[in-house]
Every structure is written in C-alpha cells, then in structure tokens.
UniProtKB/Swiss-Prot annotation:
Chain segments carrying region Disordered: 79-142
Family: Belongs to the UPF0461 family.
Cross-link Glycyl lysine isopeptide (Lys-Gly) (interchain with G-Cter in SUMO2), sequence positions: K75, K184
Modified residues (Phosphoserine): S37, S121, S180
Stretches with biased composition (Basic residues): 80-92
Pfam families: DUF5568 (PF17724)
Comp. bias intervals (Polar residues): 94-107
Domain of life: Eukaryota
Keywords: Isopeptide bond, Phosphoprotein, Ubl conjugation
Native species: Bos taurus (Bovine)
The protein's name: UPF0461 protein C5orf24 homolog
Length: 188
C-alpha cells in the first residue's frame, strides 16, 4: 500500500507547482551552507597535497591528433623501421622464416634441424638420425650388430650349422620308435 509522503508544505506538491520547486531550491542552498561550515570546522586536519602534472611525450600527442586509419599506418611503418637493423628474436635476419635454418644458432649448417643429428655430437655422421643405427658408437662400423661378432667368436665354419643343438630328423616316420634315453642333451 502506498502512503503519501509528508512534507512541510500542507498543500500537495505536484510536478510543475512553483511553491514546491522554490522550497527544494531553498533546501539545497541550506545544505550547501551546512557543508561549507562543516568543512571549515575540520579544515585544520585535512592536508591537500598539490598534484604534479606530468607531460606526455610529443610522440603520443601526434598519435592522438591523427585520424584512426592513419595511426594504424604509422604503427605499421614503425614496426618495419624497427626490424630493419635488428635480427629476429632467435638470431635470424628479418624477412626470413624459421624453416630457412635460422631457428637456433647451435653451430649446425643452415637448413638442417635438430633431428638431423646436430643437437649433440654422438659420433654418427651428419644428417643421420638416431633411428638409423647410430645410437651408440663403440668403435664398430655403423649397422653392425654385437651378436654378429659373438657368432664369429663361436668358431662355426661355413660347413656347420650355426644352431648347436642336434636336429631330430623324424625317425618315427620311418617306423623306428625312439625312447627318451636315446636323445642326449648337448654338452654345455
């Protein structure tokens, strides 16, 4: 439920009535007088520090005065001028791409990548990868296997088989039965 707000004026103050407007103006002036007297009352405790105005660079002022489209062009020109004498962030000249070989400066020839074997020098030829059989280099030629050298040490000739266990040829197929006592395990 809505109740009318009581005011000091016994007549209803509606919009556009001059008596209400004048009363509001009087109240506003009275409030201002109270504020100024209160401010004088506490003025000894409040200290105002003078603000120091700082002047901006004239370069920024020119950017503010130019039109929106023109300022974009000026920014692009500044970027181009900035890169003329300087190289890129990873040591390659401006205008070149990372794929041109300027990605890092680790001593590799241009156009090569880390995967081509220039990350460290593990003893394999340049341009080969770890998967090409050059993972370790203990003095053997690349591609040789340790097992081949072990087989050579066993002393098998060309006429003998490299498999040292006796092969059982199917004697049971010919009708002769074998017992487990006849099969001898090899001497180790």
């Amino acid at each position: 439920m809505m109740h009318p707000v009581a005011s000091s004026n016994p007549a209803f103050c509606g919009p556009g009535k001059p008596s209400c407007l004048n009363e509001d103006a009087m109240r506003a002036a009275d409030q201002f007088d109270i504020y100024s007297s209160q401010q004088n009352k506490y003025s000894h405790t409040v200290s105002h520090k003078p603000m120091v105005c700082q002047r901006q660079d004239p370069l920024n002022e020119t950017h503010l005065q130019t039109a929106g489209g023109r300022s974009i062009e000026i920014k692009d020109e500044l970027k181009k001028k900035k890169n003329l004498n300087r190289s890129g962030k990873r040591g390659r000249p401006s205008g070149t791409t990372k794929s041109a070989g300027y990605r890092t400066s680790t001593g590799r020839p241009l156009g090569t990548t880390k995967a081509a074997g220039f990350k460290t020098s593990p003893g394999r030829p340049l341009g080969t990868t770890k998967a090409a059989g050059y993972k370790v280099s203990p003095g053997r030629p690349p591609g040789s296997i340790k097992a081949l050298s072990r087989l050579a040490d066993l002393g098998y000739g060309c006429g003998t088989a490299a498999f040292p266990y006796p092969m059982i040829h199917g004697r049971a197929v010919h009708g002769v039965e074998e017992t487990s006592s006849e099969i001898k395990p090899p001497n180790e």
